[in-house]
Amino acid sequence: MSEIRFYRSSEKPFGAFSNLYRREIEFEGTTFATSEHAYQAGKPRKPAVRKWLMDAPSPALLAMAAHGLYYWDVAPGWSTSKFDRMRAVLRAKFTQHPDLFELLIGTSEARLVEAATVDNEVNRLWGEVNGVGRNMLGELLMELRAELRDQDADSDTYITAAE
């Protein structure tokens, strides 16, 4: 099986798989600058902390700030709900943009790996560092790819989030 490794949002073409890739998405009635913004908006317990995160000057700084939240600022149940939220955010991202839909579907059966370079707990959860990690972002993308491919089998157009 072939493998597609991605990490930096600026790397063509598969940097678009990064949550830091700058592409607006509509999620839960709000327009977010990136899928990272949509994902992290669910993490804070307090609206003031959410606003502070959403005002970060870049998606990378947003991610760093969100990873450093104190436990009392994190929504109850986040550790168990975050994967479902990421699944929903990715579905919104890849169904709202035909080019991203085609890019994901075009990876065929390749293993998708977020290949991080800095070894830490977060990078080993969402990706792999030196081949070690759960690669949850890659796993969720492959799950979404299979779902979208099955839904698209009888259609000539991409699936919209409303469908």
What are these model-predicted stretches?
Residues M1-E163:
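Charged, low-complexity intrinsically disordered segments
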